[in-house]
Amino acid sequence: MKIILILSIFLICFLQLGQSVIDPSQNEVMSDLLFNLYGYDKSLDPCNNNYVECEYINTTSTIQTVKSLSLGAPLHQYVITQDLTPLQNLTSFEVNEKIYLTSSFFNYINKFSQLERIVTYSLNLTIPDDTIFPAIFETFTIYKPSVPLSKVIFESPIKNLYVDSPLTGYSIPTLVNVNPYLGNLQLPVTYYSGFPSNLSQAFPNLQYLAIYVNNDMNQNNYHNFSISNIGVFKNLKGLDIEFTDSDNPQEFSIHSFLSNVPIIDNLYIYGQGVTIDPSVGIIDLSYINPKTFLKIQIQQTSLLNNCKGIILKSPKKASFNSYYNTFSYECIDFSNIADFSDYYNDYEQYLPNIDNAPLLTGVDIYQSVVVGDIPESYCRINYLSLYYNQLNGTVPSCIQCLGGVKGGDIVLPNPFLNFNKTTEPYCPTFKIDENYTHLVATDGTEKLIITGTNLGWDGNDITPIIANSKLGITIPKGVGTNKSITVTFQNGEQRTFNYSYVPPFIKSYGFLELDGHKYFTINGTGFDFVDSNNITINDQQITFDNAMGGGDNDGLIIFPIDELPNFATESKFTVSALVGGQSSNEVTFYYFNSINITEEKLVLNNTGGSVDINGSFGTNNTSLVSVSINGTNCLVTSYTNSKLTITYPSNQVGDNYVLTLNVGGYAVNLVVEYIEGGETPTPSTTPSTTPSTTPSSTPTQSPDDDGSTSSTLSTSFYLITLLFLIQQFI
C-alpha cells in the first residue's frame, strides 16, 4: 500500500512538472491586477486571460513570463497602483481610457528593459521630467491627454510619438534640446496648446509629421491662431496636415511648412481652414527633389478656394489627387504633373487645358461638374477616365475610333452631343507609320515601338507609351532574324510586324559562385535566354547555359570553371559567340584568377573629384585597366596591383550608380552613391527606416489560441487528488 501511495505522489509531482506555470513573482502582481480590473479569479492562471500574452522563458522551460498586456475596459475606472516591475519581460503595454497610470509607474519604467511600446487611451498626469525610458523603447501612443506633455517625452530616444484627441489642459512644451532619434511624430494643435516653431531643428531626422489642428471657432474663447516652422526638414518624407471641420472654421497659413521639405514624397491636407498666405502668392513645390515622385492629396479643404490664377506648382512627375474640393483648374500649374485625379468637384468648368503639360500621363475626373468638349489633346493621355461627369459637348476622334462599347468605358456616362453607348466605331484617321525599329532585345524586356495616328490605348500584347500615337508591342524572349508578330488594336484592326533580335555582343568576363560551385561567366547582350549558347574560346566550341539577368543589366552566361581549358595568369584568350545564326564580335581577354575591390560601396561628391580604390587587381600593366561609372569613363591617374586612383565625373545626387573596373576584360562592379559636393565621402552605414503609420484607435485583445499560452490544470486539482489517494490507503 505504501508503494502505491509513493508512486501516486511521484506521478502527481511528475505531471505537475510537465505543466506550464507563470513566474511566481509575476503571478502575484498579475492576479491582483486582473482581479481589481475584471474580477478575474486569483486562483486562475493570468496567462489564460484574454488581455495577457505570455511566452515561455526559454525553449526548455515550463515557466511562462508576461510579454504583452492589452488591458481593455475594466468594471470601473481604475488607477494602477501595483508595482509592475516584476514584469521584466514586458514588451508591449496598452491600457483602456478608464485605466490610469501614476507617476510612480514612470519612475520605474526604465526597469522594463524589453519594453518597446506603450499605448494609453487617456493621460491625466504630467510625466515627471526625470523619467528615464528604456533604451529600446520605440513607440509611445497617447490618446485624450488632459495635461501638459512633459518635455522628457520629446527628448527621450523614442522613435515614434503619436498623440491624438487632446482634452482641456493639453499643451506642448517648448523644445530646447536636439533629438536625433524621433522619426515619426503625430501632434494635435489647439488654440491653447501652443506649438513649437523649431520642429525641424529639434528633430533633424524626422521622416513623418502629422499635425492635427483643432480650428473650431465655435468653441468658447477660441480665437485666431497660427503655426509655423523655422528651418528645413532635411529628412521629412511625409507631411500630413488635418483640420477639424466646423461651421466657422479658422484660417491657417501653412507656407512655412511647405517651403522647407526638399525630399518629401507624400503631402496630405484635409479639412476646412488651410489657406495660402496672400503675401506668398503661390505655393511653389517645384524645388522638391523630383526623384521622390511627390504625391499631393487634398480632401475637403479650402486650400484652392477662390484662387486668382495659378497658386500651386508641383515638382516634376508629381501626382495630384483631390476629393470633395471645390476649386478651379486654373489654380494649378500642370507643367510638372504626371497624374491628376479630381473626385466630386462642384466647381462648374471645362476640362483642364493640358497643352503645356508634357509629363501628364494620367487624368481621372469623376462625378465633377465639368462641361463642354473633350479636346483632342486628351487622346495622348495613357490612363484616361472621365465618366459620370456633365460633359455635354463632343468627343475627340480617338474615342470615336473605339465606338460606344470600348470608348464608353473611358468617357460614359456623360451627355455628349455626338457619342453614346450605341455609337459605332468610326476611324478613318487610323494610320501606322512604316519606319519603326525592327531590332529587339533577346531577353523579352524590350518592346517593338510603333508610331501612328489614333492607334488606341491597348490591345493584345500592346501597351501605350503615348496613347494613340506611340505604342509598344511585347516581344517574347528569343533569338534570330526574320520574325513576325500579328497584333489586334483596340479598334479591331489587325496588323503584322516584322522584326529581328539583336546579335550577340560580348563585353567582359568574370567568375560566379552558385550553390557551392564556381563558374566562369561571360557578360554581354544578345545571348539566348531560352536555350544554350554556343561560345568559341581559342577556337574551341563550348556550350554555355541559357542566359541570366537582362533588362537594365547585361545578360550573363555561365560555364563550370573546372571544365574550362587551363589558362596561365595574364595569358591571352579569344572569345566569340554564335546565337540564333548571328555571330558576335570577337574579343581578346587576359586571364586572371581573381580581381576584387576592398570597398563594399563608394561614396562620391556630385561635383566630381578624385578617389582611391583598394583591392587586388592582378597586374601592374596599366594598359589593361579601365574604370567607368554608368558607362562614362574615368581617368586612372595612379595604379598599382593593390591600389588605384581615379578622377571621376560629376553626377546628380543618388545611389543608383555602378562603377565598373575592367582589367584585361575581367569586370568587377561596385555600387556608387553621389552626395552633395562639400560633404566628406564616406561609406554609408545608416540603415533605412519606414515611417510608421498612425496606430489603431481601439485597444486590441490578445487571443488565447495563438500558441503563446497554454491551459494548465490548477495546483488545487492535484492536491485534491493527492488527499483522496492518501485517504484511501490510510
Swiss-Prot record:
Location of the region described as 3 X 4 AA tandem repeats of P-S-T-T in the Swiss-Prot/TrEMBL record: 683-694
IPT/TIG domain: which residues? 504-592
Quote the residue positions with lipidation, kind GPI-like-anchor amidated serine. S708
Topology of this chain in the membrane: Lipid-anchor; GPI-anchor
Its main localization is membrane
Annotated coiled-coil positions are none
Pro-piece positions: 709-730
Q: Which Pfam families match?
A: TIG
Q: What are the subcellular locations of this protein?
A: Cell membrane
Q: Which domain of life is it from?
A: Eukaryota
Which residues does the record list as glycosylated?
Answer: 58, 89, 124, 198, 224, 392, 420, 435, 482, 498, 523, 534, 596, 605, 614, 620-621, 630
Please state the span of the N-terminal signal peptide per the UniProt entry: 1-20
**Keywords from the UniProt entry:** Cell membrane, Glycoprotein, GPI-anchor, Lipoprotein, Membrane, Repeat, Signal
Positions of the region Disordered? 678-711
Bias (Low complexity) occurs at: 680-711
- Write out the GO cellular component annotations: phagocytic vesicle; plasma membrane; side of membrane
Instruction: Write out the PTM section of this UniProt entry.
Output: The sugar chains may play important roles in cell fusion. The GPI-like-anchor contains a phosphoceramide group, rather than a phosphatidyl group.
State the Gene Ontology BP annotations.
Answer: pinocytosis; sexual macrocyst formation
PANTHER family given for it? Answer: CELL SURFACE GLYCOPROTEIN GP138-RELATED-RELATED (PTHR31093), CELL SURFACE GLYCOPROTEIN-RELATED (PTHR31093:SF4)
Q: What else is known?
A: gp138a expression is much higher than that of gp138b and may well be the major gene for gp138 product.
Role description: Involved in the sexual cell fusion of D.discoideum.
Task: From the Swiss-Prot or TrEMBL record, give the protein name.
Answer: Cell surface glycoprotein gp138A
Question: Which species is this record about?
Answer: Dictyostelium discoideum (Social amoeba)
